Regions:
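Accessory interaction regions appended to the cores of large information-processing enzymes
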Residues: 29, 38, 190-191, 203-206, ...
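C-terminal or mid-to-C-terminal helical accessory/interaction module adjacent to the motor/catalytic core
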Residues: 80, 86-87, 126-210, 281-285
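Pre-Walker A segment
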Residues: 265, 269-290, 295, 301, ...
Length: 966
């Protein structure tokens, strides 16, 4: 029998397609890209390591030839694909029909080197009909699409690898720059600047409830007083909070009411008679929205479902791979003839002929740069499955997103909504005031009635309940005729303040990038994830708040490399990539122009070389906060975080404080808090100074004035740095404390990030009192360890969270690990990624797919090397050597040598309310220390053998303690 190998991107997609193809076909996944540019020096092949261009992974001297490598975690899988290819009679590359998919197919062809016929198969939905049609109509690999993807990858590498080191040297270590991420960051920063410069304006008006002779009531609002319009929000200047000036530099002719004036007017208007001066009614129609493209799906996923962009795309990916929707990365809103017929048929059957648009609706892409042709995102197949029919098949996220996609697709072929807009003006006169006669007033009342809902029966943008939304959209006014009188029954003064422009949410940032022509459907979610992962933005509710680091980075790029973060320039790069994809531009000349420059234009490489010396690191890191101007307070971004200074006084800026929330009173308060060094005295045993410090994560005490410090300990709740005594500081520095030995293991009392706890081997238990750390005994500790272990806020950790059973493989368990929930089958583990759900909604096939894609064998712990003898340490200011005291020694002296740490997932550093996780564990310096003899109460000297603080480079230690930049 003929054996045809079909390769797609993901295991889930492979399983769905294999069901449709049947015998004679083997469907395997590539698990994404199999090759890429080297991610580190370790991945660069030995023969290229000495090449000047090797770090880029691009030979800039040879037409930007890419150095592609198979990463270590893909080598085993690539070997498997090679074996399958060798046994196949034909190879079909069925990756996605876009640039990335075309590139994956090309890389597979290059790496597998098949000796059998090769075909390229493309489809936009995973249904039996679509797959069989694609098999019957193969094509060749589109080299133009491959060239465009290679150009995009090269651009990103050149931009990132050239610009990021500038940020490391001039702003802070470990920052990154990116072709799109830096522009997205600039958008966030510019919006925050608008908020920081914003000055609120205030005004008052009057809200009325009027009644007709028939006792029908309706709302109205005071709009004019003595023929002059009342001020509204649009009349105020955002920079001053005052009324805008007209062409003659005079404020606009409007009335600004104070609270007192508004209350006086309201009292004089209550129960007044008003006359209908005019009543207008105009019809309106509203057309349905086009079916979803990637950006609008992400925007509505956020507005309607509360999903982030990445969550939306994860759910959409699963729906696509399961055969429920069409391809989810598209900027075309068009529907195929088959889909149009399916939508129209469903409208007719579910809503009736009256709700069907007279003619099929055809939608064209708004973007002139719409990528390779796809359909809109819609339910898959020639007939759409209703959401109700899929309730038992889809997980929560998948069902809710499918419901959204289905409604939008069906509504796109429905009839227009029709209605009427009403506008009524009421004139009247106030009663006399104490200061004179009454005043003429004019009130406005507006209404909206929907006569025929049309497509709104199925879909209302921004709402999850169309019927409720329709009611909210209607404000019905009673029939009113000119000269008819009504009564102003209730008059309520209403105060208002202008609001700063709203921060970007994930949805509005996608909309903003799309409006600028920046990014593509495949990149929006990753851009948003990247700017958060890199520390340029943080979520506050649904808003994206730029960090101070983002301000400094954007300032540097705007002032010295303005073109690289220019919106038009970045959009032009997207257009150029489209031109390469269409075969109208060539990759190599384009990259040469970008990197080296041409026609008098300077490329990125010479630009950085010429600008580097001109960059004033202090200037770009100094941020002039509008609310602090004239106060002498400067805000800076140091190598270890943001801080402010006033003369010699410095203070860290809390990480959770948004830039626009830093006001002068708050800044003065932060600067007045204890900061800097507080000498407390000399430790009588070691001769080292004891110093109190204010760190980013709270106050702490430090033993020694050398760098790095000998020992540190955070203060307990209730301790005050300004009144802390030497005796108290020395007591804190005895922690971690060796309590004794239980079941052959040392028991330690420690103060950690989440409070006081006991540690025995790999087991730990929280205790209720910080002070108890100094007095807890072995019997009390053993009683604590006999209690069930609790994690977080009391959720007991007991066995797997869920178990997935399979007929063809061992069960997969969902467990809670120290780095979050993970899947395991006993041989491989796969951690659920950041932002993924807890796993409660995972289906068995999801668990299998994740484990197959990301599963890794647990790493075995390397055998420990023989510990080196610690060098003696000298006390500061003295020539004596501090000797090590045995734990069994009866003397209760406390000494300084490095201390042995019990194994624990998170090592508390400086007991300063923060922790160092596994990436820094390699920095731990182990020192040989004898264990305390069993069943002996430890002396004070045992503290010298307590868990060691992590031995870090001073730069890292400063970063974690939050020490102010010099």
């Amino acid at each position: 029998m003929t054996n045809i190998l079909v390769i797609v991107e993901s295991p889930a997609k492979a399983r769905t397609i294999e069901k449709y193809l049947g015998k004679g076909y083997t469907v395997e996944s590539s698990i994404g890209h199999i090759r890429d540019l080297p991610r580190s020096a370790a991945e660069i092949p030995e023969k290229y390591k000495n090449e000047a261009w090797a770090r880029l992974g691009l030979n800039v001297e040879d037409d930007f030839r890419a150095l592609y490598v198979v990463s270590a975690d893909k080598k085993q899988h690539v070997a498997k694909l090679k074996r399958l290819t060798a046994d196949a009679d034909e190879l079909i590359l069925a990756t996605d029909d876009d640039r990335e998919g075309e590139s994956i197919a090309w890389h597979l062809l290059q790496e597998l080197k098949p000796k059998v016929p090769v075909k390229r198969m493309v489809f936009h939905e995973i249904t039996r009909e679509a797959i069989l049609a694609a098999i019957a109509n193969p094509r060749d690999i589109d080299t133009n699409l491959v060239e465009a993807q290679e150009a995009r990858r090269a651009l990103d590498r050149l931009y990132g690898y050239e610009v990021s080191p500038v940020l490391w040297r001039k702003v802070a270590p470990k920052l990154s720059a990116g072709r799109v991420q830096s522009v997205a960051t600039r958008l966030l920063v510019q919006r925050e600047w608008e908020r920081m410069r914003f000055v609120s304006g205030s005004w008052w008006d009057i809200e009325a409830v009027c009644t007709t002779a028939d006792q029908a009531s309706f709302p109205a609002r005071l709009s004019e007083l003595n023929g002059v319009r009342l001020a509204q929000g649009r009349d105020f200047d955002a920079a001053t909070g005052r009324l805008k000036l007209g062409p003659d530099d005079k404020p606009a002719a409007v009335v600004t009411l104070s609270e007192a004036q508004a209350r006086d007017l309201a009292s004089r208007l209550t129960n007044s008679t008003l006359t209908v001066a005019s009543a207008e009614e105009k019809p309106f129609t509203q057309k349905p929205y086009p079916p979803f493209i990637t950006s609008t799906l992400q925007q509505e996923g956020s507005r309607k479902l509360g999903f982030g962009a990445q969550r939306t795309m994860r759910a959409a990916q699963k729906l696509y791979e399961g055969g429920y929707i069409t391809y989810m990365r598209t900027d075309s809103p068009n529907l195929s003839a088959e889909a149009m017929n399916a939508a129209r048929s469903q409208v007719k059957s579910m809503y009736g002929d009256a709700y069907l648009s007279p003619q099929p609706r055809i939608y064209a892409a708004k973007s002139k740069n719409a990528q390779e042709a796809h359909e809109a995102i819609r339910p898959a197949g020639g007939s759409f499955r209703t959401p109700d029919s899929l309730r038992g098949e889809l997980d929560s996220d998948g069902w809710r997103l499918y419901d959204l996609i289905w409604k939008r697709a069906v509504a796109s072929q429905m009839a227009d909504a029709r209605g009427r807009r009403m506008q009524v003006r009421l004139s009247g006169q106030t009663g006399d005031s104490e200061n004179g006669a009454g005043q003429k007033v004019l009130l406005n009342a507006s209404g909206r009635a929907i006569d025929f809902p049309g497509f709104l029966r199925a879909y209302v943008e921004g709402s999850d309940d169309p019927n409720a939304a329709l009611e909210d959209r209607e404000v019905i006014l009673p029939p009113l005729r000119v000269s008819e009188t009504v009564t102003g029954k209730v008059m309520t003064p209403s105060g208002h303040e202008t609001q700063p422009p709203a921060r970007f949410t994930e949805a509005s940032l996608v909309q903003g990038l799309e409006a600028q022509g920046i990014g593509r459907p495949s990149t929006y979610a990753s851009i948003i994830g990247t700017i958060q992962d890199r520390g340029y933005a943080a979520k506050k509710g649904s808003a994206l708040v730029p960090t101070w680091t983002a301000f400094a980075t954007s300032a540097l790029l705007e002032h010295h490399f303005g073109k690289l973060v220019d919106y038009d320039f970045t959009a032009k790069m997207e257009e150029d990539l489209d031109e390469i994809a269409g075969g109208r531009k060539q990759r190599v000349p384009y990259l040469r122009s970008f990197y080296l420059g041409d026609n008098g234009g300077m490329g990125i490489h010479p630009l950085i070389e010429t600008q580097m010396a001109a960059i004033d690191a202090r200037a770009v890191a100094t941020i002039e906060v509008p609310k602090l101007v004239g106060s002498g307070i400067e805000v800076r971004v140091g190598r270890y975080g943001p801080y402010m200074s006033q003369g010699e006084v410095k203070a860290n800026i809390p990480l959770e404080l948004a830039p626009d929330e830093l006001t002068l009173p708050l800044a003065l308060d932060l600067l007045s808090r204890p900061s800097g060094d507080h000498p407390l005295g000399i430790d009588p045993e070691s001769g080292l100074p004891v110093i109190g410090k204010a760190g980013r994560f709270g106050p702490y005490v430090q033993l020694g004035d050398t760098l790095p410090p000998t020992r540190t300990a955070s203060l307990f709740p209730g301790d005050d740095l300004s009144t802390l005594s030497l005796e108290r500081a020395l007591k804190l520095l005895t922690l971690p404390r060796l309590v004794g030995v239980s079941e052959g293991e040392e028991v330690w009392a420690l103060n950690g990030k989440f409070g006081p706890y006991l540690k025995r081997g790999t087991d730990s238990r929280s205790i209720t009192s910080h002070e108890g750390l100094f007095s807890v005994t072995i019997p009390e500790a053993e009683e604590a360890f006999r209690q069930p272990r609790f994690k977080g806020r009391g959720s007991a950790v007991a066995g797997p969270l869920r178990t997935f059973e399979y007929a063809d493989r061992t069960a997969i368990l969902l467990k809670s690990g120290r780095f979050g929930p993970y899947l395991t089958d006993g041989e491989r583990n796969a951690t659920l990624r950041k932002g993924e759900e807890s796993g409660a909604d995972l289906l068995p096939e999801d668990a299998r797919s994740i484990l197959e894609e990301r599963g890794k064998e647990p790493q075995k712990k390397p055998s420990k090397a023989a510990p080196k003898k610690a060098a003696p340490r000298k006390a500061a200011g003295k020539g004596t050597t501090v000797s090590k005291t045995s734990a069994s020694k009866s003397t209760a002296s406390r000494k300084v040598p490095a201390r042995k740490a019990p194994a624990r997932p998170v090592v508390s550093l400086a007991d300063s309310g923060m922790a160092i996780h596994s990436p820094l564990k390699s920095a731990v310096k182990k020192t040989a220390v004898k264990k305390a003899a069993p069943k002996k109460t430890p002396s004070r000297s045992a503290a010298a053998k307590a868990p060691a603080k992590v031995a870090l480079a001073w730069a890292d230690l400063k970063a974690h303690l939050g020490v102010l930049s010099e």
